[in-house]
């Protein structure tokens, strides 16, 4: 019973034996720190109130009498009596003396622009004098011009040769008599020198832009003189003769491209006989033609000019035919087959430039300022528009200046037009 009643007391005793008491060392350390802090604060406040400048007599003399302090303040200053303040007189301006001044007439400035804008009308005498002066000046200038022209003509005449070479004139009648021509043809050519000189003199004035006068001269150059013809009938010189106006049918062997100049060859496609009888074979089928073409093609041109210079026979002999023109199968001058005008490149470049310029113009922000102000965006937009406009114009102009390309394919049938009489030694024989 007794043991059961002490069960709780035993537990408490065990708890008291297992409890750890608080150590007093931290409390002492905290008290020391607080004391040190308070001591430092007190010492600092005390030092702030102490004087540091011991040499200053005024501040250090706390026990000195007030009389000595006053003497120290007025040290070096002599004794004096302070009198009454001096009265200052108020500033009064000196009166100005009135002088009699003569009144000058007032000049009113009036605008002179209307007077300058309105020209002063000339009198009749001044007008006549001015006209006479201008007339005299023109007369003097014209006289000076005529005088200088006479001096220049005289100098040219003095520098000209004194001999005239008439050897060419003597050779011309001999050649005309040898070929059966009349010497009057030379006289007609000499009579045309003056009109030719007049035309060459006024050529720079561009009085005939369509060249109508040259067309009339071309049409009437052989019928200027009425009556008999100056030339006589020339008899046939050989039975193996091919007259002018005849044609030589041929077929093109090599192709033709007008981008670059070059040489071409062809082959005679039919036998060619003499012009008088038509029975003597002069040029056999299979003979070769050698020629050249003109690569200078202008804008809008569809035909290319071809000339033939050599005729090579199957037996190996060669005949130089000078430069006879080639015509197509229908008789038109030049060759025509395929023409490339490069329109796709021209219009595609123009469309591309337009699209680029439109895109850049649309990408720029619109200006919200007044019309009189110029912002950076407006300047950029304007510069881009001008730059692309110039680029587009130059690109299109360059593409327009590109000449069209004319292509003549191999196998093209044409004719060689004989423009001079050809005399063969004999009928063709294959040796």
Swiss-Prot record:
Residues 174-189 have a biased composition (Polar residues). Residues 99-122 have a biased composition (Basic and acidic residues). Keywords: Conjugation, Membrane, Plasmid, Transmembrane, Transmembrane helix. It is found in: Membrane. It is a single-pass membrane protein. The chain crosses the membrane at residues 27-47. The keyword Electron transport does not apply. Residues 95-122, 161-189 are annotated as: Disordered. GO terms for cellular component: membrane. Disulfide bonds: none annotated. InterPro entries: T4SS_VirB10/TraB/TrbI (IPR005498), T4SS_VirB10/TrbI (IPR042217). NCBIfam families: PRK13831.1. Belongs to the TrbI/VirB10 family. This is Probable conjugal transfer protein TrbI.
